[in-house]
Amino acid sequence: MSKRLTVALIGNPNTGKSSVFNDLTGLNQKVGNYPGITVEKKEGICKLERGVKAHILDLPGTYSLNASSLDESVVIELLLNKNDKDFPDVAVVISDVENLKRNLLLFTQIKDLNIPSVLVINMSDVMKRKGISIDTSVLEKHLGTKVILYSSREKKGLSDLKNIITNYKKLETNQCLDIMNIDLEYFESLKKTFPDQSIY
């Protein structure tokens, strides 16, 4: 029996993450709470190519992997625990086309965990109206991942996203942070001074 494919939808608040979740799962979803806390847990099933089914988790909105709220702690604890039954095979990071630069911090942090990741730039239907242009090929080169322009309103990018999820093993898992060029002594001294802070 093949391992269940688990997909985590991650993003800043108000990036349209729940719309992508609804597009993927339709009515095959349920809402509960994480054990012992009142943070909402949304999950569903998505039917992919070749009869593959994916377990989709719509994680609480978070700005970074430096937790400042209970919601953000849920996201971090899951992504740092490979033994968690819900640890994702692939992370789908949802960004807002109008706030892409801010959203990229979270994406790079997740990618640096070596989790296969895809960047979804949501609300692409407003690009023309707002005079925004994005060269996805340049972004893909710099981020080392697949980038999808997505519009829930127009259902644009949904089939591409499903295809990438199905073939997630082809995604690169290289880190955005070049650890080979870091002054390790500098970061070790910072870690002693700020033991509770991440490298970011």
Task: Describe each model-derived feature in a short phrase.
Residues 31, 67, 98, 131, ...:
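Catalytic cores of large soluble enzymes that bind and process phosphate-bearing ligands
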Residues 125-178:
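Canonical P-loop GTPase G-domain recognition
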Residues 182-200:
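Extracytoplasmic
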Residues 36, 61-64, 97-100, 123-128, ...:
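Conserved nucleotide-binding/hydrolysis micro-motifs of P-loop NTPases
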